[in-house]
């Protein structure tokens, strides 16, 4: 079963490297619990942000707070079902392990360092949905920057 590291996504948190290349895909759509979380939260796929929107930061300026929260709750649901989060708390070690497994990154890799930085940046946020979306957005944005810099090298 694939896990979301924001997907991390996003976690997702998340074959993020490959998912971020397909900017039209919805965040989290490649993971096993995607449909389950949409159903449980009464969210339609049309309400979810695309990976491109999140990577570029457009999700923060083009959408209402309720849409941001809804998207975050879907991310949190998937993270929790994959055992990466309980409520608003991350299992940081499991996130790292699953991220390394999904991406093939190694400890010390810039992608793992980006995940660590994103977890650190969001660790004190109390709202589990907001925290999840911000984490996924942070990881996706970092991966996009790293992919751009490696393509330019």
Curated annotation (Swiss-Prot):
The keyword Translocase does not apply. GO terms for molecular function: pheromone binding. Transmembrane segments: none annotated. GO terms for cellular component: extracellular space. Keywords: Behavior, Disulfide bond, Pheromone response, Pheromone-binding, Secreted, Signal, Transport. InterPro entries: PBP/GOBP (IPR006170), PBP_GOBP_sf (IPR036728), Pheromone-bd_protein_Gp-9 (IPR022354). It is found in: Secreted. Disulfide bonds join 37-77, 73-129, 118-138. GO terms for biological process: response to pheromone; social behavior. It comes from the Eukaryota. Residues 1-19 form the signal peptide. The keyword Secreted applies. Belongs to the PBP/GOBP family. Homodimer. Colony queen number, a major feature of social organization, is associated with worker genotype for Gp-9. Colonies are headed by either a single reproductive queen (monogyne form) or multiple queens (polygyne form). Differences in worker Gp-9 genotypes between social forms may cause differences in workers' abilities to recognize queens and regulate their numbers. This is Pheromone-binding protein Gp-9. The gene is Gp-9.
């Amino acid at each position: 079963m694939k896990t979301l590291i924001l997907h991390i996504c996003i976690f997702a948190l998340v074959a993020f490297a490959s998912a971020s290349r397909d900017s039209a895909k919805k965040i989290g759509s490649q993971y096993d619990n995607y449909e389950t979380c949409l159903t449980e939260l009464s969210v339609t796929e049309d309400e979810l942000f695309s990976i491109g929107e999140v990577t570029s930061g457009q999700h923060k300026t083009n959408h209402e707070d309720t849409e941001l929260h809804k998207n975050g709750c879907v991310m949190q649901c998937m993270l929790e079902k994959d055992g990466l989060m309980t409520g608003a708390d991350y299992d940081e070690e499991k996130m790292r392990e699953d991220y390394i497994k999904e991406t093939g990154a190694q400890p010390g890799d810039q992608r793992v360092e980006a995940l660590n930085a994103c977890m650190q940046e969001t660790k004190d946020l109390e709202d589990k949905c907001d925290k999840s979306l911000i984490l996924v957005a942070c990881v996706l944005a970092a991966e996009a920057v790293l992919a751009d810099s490696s393509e330019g090298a």
